Amino acid sequence: MKIGLFTATYLDLGLAEVCKLASGLGYQAVELPAFAGNPHLDLDEVLKGSNAKTLAKMIGGYGLIISALANHPEGQIVLGPYGKDTDAIRKGTKEEKIKFGTERMIKTAQAANALGVPVVTGFVGCENFGRFFPWPYSKGWADMEQEFVERWGKILDKFAEYGVKFAHEPHPNELVYDVDSALRSVELMGGRKEWGFNFDPANLIYLDIHVENFIDQLKGRIYHVHAKDGEVVEHNVKRSGRIPQGDWQRLGRGFRFRIPGWGSVPWKKVLTELPLIGYDYVLSYEHEDVTMSRHDGITKTIAYLQPLLIEKPYEGRHDVLFQ
């Protein structure tokens, strides 16, 4: 496995500068944001002429690969929510937002193809996450599932044309957020290979899910991994629960995102289970830890994870007792 960096953490720096920083610390991959207006990747520009080859060559010059293109915001508005909740992503009517999100996700797949990148990470959206509870409208979740099939099925048709896979990141406020909803989504999509997951263990322990269960149940569908931790703050969780509101730096929170090794994710178990299901791609570090700087995060993360990576599989026993 390789350890990579999600460059969205460093949008105030030029991409070449970020690549130099990551490479110098021992990172081997970058995950590039693809949403409109970000300075690291302009989808329209990269699809012109030889720009994709030029960009890939620049990144490769630092000894890095591009593990994925990430487009969480624009994927979100395919299924919602709409209104002012997502005006920062794209202002407009519900129909205008769906159209924009759909077109942008297809263009992200096109750019991934041009860059030789096998996967796009992102969100699928969810118009009303509160519908996980069947009152006051018991068919609300089923309605959203049908919209998921209709809208994302068309997007995935284009992903198939471009030879790119989509890795949804299970997360609160998404139609797919846990093991059961992930398995259900595979069923809804008819098992098509373009549909899979960006496994982020922090998002799962947020909801008290054993991350090993997700790895084992979704084997063959994990196309990308985020190296992010989450801390269950034991002295607060009995008061606020796992889904507290308010500032992420608030002392009373029962949960907060952390860098790997500083939270509650069992990393030795994660890095045992992933090879067992055949995952040998990238662990992409994403900095969302509000307790420490980016410099702390980027240096501490690789120092923590690198020694945990299993370099070679078990060779078997060859003594007489095991013949």
Language-model features: where?
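Residues at the N-termini of beta-strands
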Residues: 29, 119, 224, 281-282
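Acidic/histidine-rich catalytic cores of soluble enzymes
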Residues: 2, 19, 29, 69, ...
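Active-site beta-loop-alpha junctions enriched in small/polar residues
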Residues: 6-10, 33-35, 71-74, 125-127, ...
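C-terminal helical cap(s) of enzyme catalytic domains, especially alpha/beta-barrels
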Residues: 294-314, 321
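Short, acidic/polar
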Residues: 11-22, 99-111, 207-216, 267-270
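Glycine-rich, proline-tolerant flexible connector loops at the mouths of alpha/beta enzymes
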Residues: 33-56, 60, 127-130
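Active-site acidic/histidine proton-transfer and metal-coordination neighborhood
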Residues: 17, 61, 76-197, 295, ...
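Acidic (Asp/Glu)-rich catalytic clusters
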Residues: 19-24, 46-68, 110-116, 153-161, ...
